[in-house]
Every structure is written in structure tokens, then in C-alpha cells.
A protein has these predicted regions:
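Conserved N-terminal/central alpha/beta ligand/cofactor-binding core
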Residues: 2-122
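Predominantly flavin-linked oxidoreductase catalytic cores and closely associated redox partners
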Residues: 107-171
Length: 172
């Protein structure tokens, strides 16, 4: 069984082990997950705190449509709303968090990510294993500062995933 060697002491950060894409690269940990996508503000993050609950749900539903369009068409969307289990929880004084969940499964999730990358690779520049120190606005665009160089762009999509979420909170 593979295990990430980062322990915080001897190995403080990613050593970019060649066969390991557990937390980074296109899809990051999601490339090896079971492909469950939650559509809810009740758990899983606080995007709604920045853009409002309705906008957050709209974005999650957009991501769901993209997942379906890029290979997840035969998968099911589950919901806790109005279920027998939801009623049973209420009868017993429990509050069931409301969510819709698209379960792609590991294999289909990987196909979706492959299809997305194939669609985007010629339309955008991807930089993997390029730790970003800072991002600043400048001359109607953005300057992305890495350990080795600086990049200027008119539009910038920062996709840090779980492994970079704490850093992203500091930058924003």
C-alpha cells in the first residue's frame, strides 16, 4: 500500500516522488477519489461565505453539468431531500444535512478528468509542481510569482485543491 512520505519533520513537504500524484497534478487527490461531488452549502467548505449561498449552489450545479458532459452522463444524482430517511431523522429529533451528491465512481471520475484535460490543454497553460509565492494585480492583469520565475497573464485561474487551500486563504 502506498503512503505519502510527508511527516512534517524528516519530510516536511512534497518531494515530488515520480509515481505519486496523491495530492497534486491535474485532478490532484480527486484523480484517485471515488468521485463523489457534493452539491450543498451545509458541509465541505465555505465558498458560500464569499459569494452567497445561491451563487455557490449555482457554481456547484455548473460543475456537476461539466462532469456529466465530460463523461459522467450515465451516473446518478442522489439527494437527501424528501427521503424516507430524512423523515425518520426528523421523527427522532435529528437534523439531516441537505445535499445532492453525484457519484461518478473512481473509473468514471478519472475519465472525466482525462476528457477535461484533453479539452483544455491546448487552450491554457498548465504549470505543475510550480509553487506560487504570490499573485498580484498589475497593468490590467495578474503577475504570478513562483520560486523560479514570474508570469504575466490577462486572466488567471488558480486551482489549488485541498493541498493548497490554506495558502489560498492567506492570499485571498
Amino acid at each position: 500500500e502506498r503512503k505519502c512520505p510527508i511527516d512534517g519533520k524528516k519530510v516536511p513537504s512534497c518531494i515530488r516522488y515520480k509515481t505519486c500524484s496523491i495530492m497534486s497534478g491535474f485532478g490532484g487527490a480527486g484523480a484517485f477519489s471515488d468521485g463523489k461531488y457534493n452539491i450543498t452549502n451545509d458541509f465541505g467548505g465555505d465558498l458560500y461565505a464569499h459569494i452567497g449561498k445561491e451563487n455557490a449552489i449555482e457554481l456547484m450545479e455548473y460543475v456537476d453539468r461539466v462532469n456529466v458532459d465530460y463523461g459522467g452522463a450515465g451516473t446518478k444524482l442522489y439527494s437527501t431531500e424528501g427521503t424516507r430517511f430524512s423523515k425518520l431523522c426528523l421523527q427522532n429529533g435529528l437534523h439531516l444535512l441537505q445535499a445532492k451528491v453525484r457519484h461518478l465512481g473512481t473509473d468514471i471520475n478519472y475519465v472525466v478528468l482525462e476528457n477535461l484535460y484533453a479539452e483544455l490543454k491546448d487552450k491554457a497553460d498548465f504549470y505543475f509542481h510550480s509553487p506560487v509565492k504570490n499573485i498580484r494585480t498589475e497593468k490590467g492583469g495578474y503577475v504570478v510569482v513562483t520560486e523560479k520565475e514570474e508570469f504575466f497573464c490577462k486572466q488567471c485561474v488558480v486551482s489549488v485543491g485541498r493541498s493548497g487551500s490554506k495558502w489560498m486563504e492567506q492570499v485571498c
